[in-house]
Amino acid sequence: MVLLIDNYDSFVYNLARYLEELGVEVEVIRNDAVTVAEVVERRPEAVVISPGPCGPGHAGISVDLVRASLGQVPILGVCLGHQVLASATGGAVVRATRPVHGQVARIDHDQGGASASGLFSGIESPLTATRYHSLVVDPETLGDEWRVTARADGGLVMAMAHTRHVAFGVQFHPESVLTVSGHRLLWNFLCAADVVSGPMPVVPDPAPAAQGHHDAVSLGHYRSESIFPDTEDLSSNGLHW
């Protein structure tokens, strides 16, 4: 099972749909409806941290979850989730010089291959992708545990890969209908996480340019839970994967 942390963003169900189209079970839980300990009890095969309308400091359990699970379970952060990964490991998230919302951009990446950034394996560079964000990760604050693997014009960080663990962040939206090779990127993550193997299944063509600000889809049949936590220390102390 892949656990998808919902940071109150309508893109989350696009992510869930793409992952299910790749043949995996997805459980969607909002960032304030579960504790870190409860996530550990679920023993997900991988964790995906969704986009959201806020900064990492207001993303519910997301930062604490990364601190507790990095190196224990594979993690993919998308947009806000990408920023959460940086923030949880000491990186700075700063305001972008120019916010972009719904902009299709060319993303230059490192072509993946056998390196830690295999997220881009089989995907042409530059990649056409959709960006919705006002904040960016400051690459000067990442240290040597993260490697920047993709950039936009001006050198803005668009993706990073952890140098020791299976953890990746992407600032853009692979689940947007205007992003090319979004399914492939998610499949590469699932392969790196050992959730799937072999050739990628045939998936539906993305829908025409979506109606709405966030290319949102119906909640449909995806499983979403509200598990209201009592007051609890969200640190990783005492948690065992």
Where are these regions (language model features)?
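Cysteine-nucleophile active-site neighborhood
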Residues: R43-S121, L186
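Acyltransferase
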Residues: V177-W241
